[in-house]
A protein has these predicted regions:
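Positively charged, structured surface patches that bind polyanionic biopolymers
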Residues: 1-94, 101-106
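Charged low-complexity intrinsically disordered patches
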Residues: 2-3, 107-126
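Amphipathic, positively biased hydrophobic alpha-helical segments used for protein targeting
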Residues: 42, 98, 122-124
Length: 126
């Protein structure tokens, strides 16, 4: 039986790091840390359509985010406040955070889809 897993990936435009919000973020003290945290949060939210949740009922807290991003809680709390001010993250009514514009960054594929793409490429190269 074939192993057909679904994969999610983050698609960044070539100009991602030139966007105003990212330039402003990285120009701040600890901005490179914040940028790193932001990318990790985008990746963490992919499977949930942009929501930062451990599961359907448990939204990530600042402490949990600090643990998964390997950063200090204070750094994560400051980063989240800045992300909200810049419109990169929005709080939801259930306490979860939503990564704004995530729909522009999400891609998905499956192992079966990848296998078919490889076959098509091989046929085109013949």
């Amino acid at each position: 039986m074939a192993d057909n897993r679904k994969y999610y990936y983050l698609k960044l435009k070539e100009s991602y790091f030139d966007e105003d919000a990212i330039v402003l973020l990285e120009s701040m003290q600890d901005g490179m840390l914040y940028s790193n945290i932001l990318l990790k949060l985008y990746l963490k939210s992919l499977k949930n359509g942009g929501k930062l949740q451990l599961d359907e009922n448990i939204p990530y807290t600042a402490q949990m985010i600090a643990t998964i991003t390997r950063q200090q809680v204070g750094t994560v709390e400051r980063a989240l406040q800045i992300f909200m001010k810049l419109g990169l993250v929005e709080p939801l009514q259930n306490g979860a955070l939503y990564m704004s514009n995530i729909e522009l960054l999400i891609g998905q594929s499956s192992t079966e889809g990848e296998r078919k793409r490889r076959e098509r490429r091989a046929l085109q190269e013949q």
